[in-house]
Amino acid sequence: MMRASYLFTSESVSEGHPDKVCDRISDEIVDLFYREGPKAGIDPWQIRAACETLATTNKVVIAGETRGPSSVTNEHIEHVVREAIKDIGYEQEGFHWKTCDIEILLHPQSADIAQGVDALQPGEVKEEGAGDQGIMFGYACNETPDLMPAPIFYAHKILRMIAEARHSGVEKVLGPDSKSQVTVRYENGKPVGVREIVVSHQHLIPDMTSAQVRERVEPYVREALPKDWITKDTIWHINPTGKFYIGGPDGDTGLTGRKIIVDTYGGAAPHGGGAFSGKDPTKVDRSAAYAARYLAKNIVAAGLADRCTLQLAYAIGVARPLSIYIDTHGTGKVSEDKLEKAAAEVMNLTPRGIRSHLDLNRPIYARTAAYGHFGRTPDNEGGFSWEKTDLAEAFKRAV
């Protein structure tokens, strides 16, 4: 049985965190292939990308496997990378969008992998299989309007609000690199307040003190959190090391796929281990995790549970999921068996079915690279389609 009263902590990192810079670059390259493919007459279903990025002092290295239009040259990729770094805001001596060295090591996808992933020609019976084996989890709960756990939801919100102020020019002395951490107090299983707040934020004036940084960031923290959650007993940790002038890849080397808990549920739910960024949606690490969130969110949105964890499992080259598992943590209005059966009925959970249902063969991935892949608002370009609750009624009928 779940404890009634406890503390739970989640962290977030900003778009300027070194690992997130790499996630953004990797996803920009995925988007580039999806933008340029149709222009070259290539079917979006045939696009493939698995792109890893390393960023360090004045150096970016990109490696991986791709399949797409020959019009995507290294010069094209380099331009996209520099624009991404510029948009994040890096114009520092140790990492500048104009002058950093960019090395590109992309090559075609393995034929051995392709033969198990690609569908055959029209009229043949084999359906495309999963791009790899693995387990993926989705989760939803009714703690926030977006059906996300409160700690990660508010950790993201704090940094997103500060980033918006920085981009608008209001906070010119703050740099791109930052981290947040929120310890939420639960009573009777519900979030009711914040015990501890951590914000470490890069500053562009070398001798800024922690107190001066707090003057800048505290208003955004207070605006991000529910009004009565911060009290006189709330403990603040703002730039607790005292100085955060050297930031981004100049301060710490970044890699794609290193912030998988930040990307998902902040530790409030299991994680299958696979990262998202840099991967086209034939990689079920990404697409099936999106589908699992979509199904879990719709179960909660339908009022069939207050909390829902959903697991999917796949084998490389095999289309159907090997298993579907649902746990409603004692909050379900119907049995988990019925929900598992309903999940298989309301959505085609083959890799192709997921890509089709969620319309994933499009350039929608760079926007997911920071502030979480879940708990976001679906946009007009098709981004965050897995956050829709349009299956809620179908679930109600199916159970």
From Swiss-Prot:
Q: Which reaction does it catalyse?
A: L-methionine + ATP + H2O = S-adenosyl-L-methionine + phosphate + diphosphate
SUPFAM superfamilies linked: S-adenosylmethionine synthetase
Q: How is the cofactor bound?
A: Binds 2 divalent ions per subunit. Binds 1 potassium ion per subunit.
The protein's required cofactors: Mg(2+); K(+)
Q: In which pathway does it act?
A: Amino-acid biosynthesis; S-adenosyl-L-methionine biosynthesis; S-adenosyl-L-methionine from L-methionine: step 1/1
Q: Name one GO biological process term.
A: one-carbon metabolic process
Q: Which GO terms describe its cellular component?
A: cytoplasm
Q: Where is this region: Flexible loop?
A: 109-119
- Binding-site positions, Mg(2+): D19
Entries under PANTHER family matching the protein: S-ADENOSYLMETHIONINE SYNTHETASE
**Top EC class for this record:** transferase
Q: What is this protein called?
A: S-adenosylmethionine synthase
Q: What is its EC number?
A: 2.5.1.6
Binding-site residues, K(+): E52
Q: Which family does it belong to?
A: Belongs to the AdoMet synthase family.
User: Could you give the subunit structure recorded for this chain?
Assistant: Homotetramer; dimer of dimers.
Chain's role = Catalyzes the formation of S-adenosylmethionine (AdoMet) from methionine and ATP. The overall synthetic reaction is composed of two sequential steps, AdoMet formation and the subsequent tripolyphosphate hydrolysis which occurs prior to release of AdoMet from the enzyme.
**GO terms assigned for molecular function:** ATP binding; magnesium ion binding; methionine adenosyltransferase activity
Compartment(s) of residence: Cytoplasm
Is Magnesium set as a keyword in this record?
Answer: yes
Q: What UniProt keywords are attached to this protein's entry?
A: ATP-binding, Cytoplasm, Magnesium, Metal-binding, Nucleotide-binding, One-carbon metabolism, Potassium, Transferase
Binding residue positions for ATP: H17, D177, S178, K179, K243, F244, D252, R258, K259, A275, K279
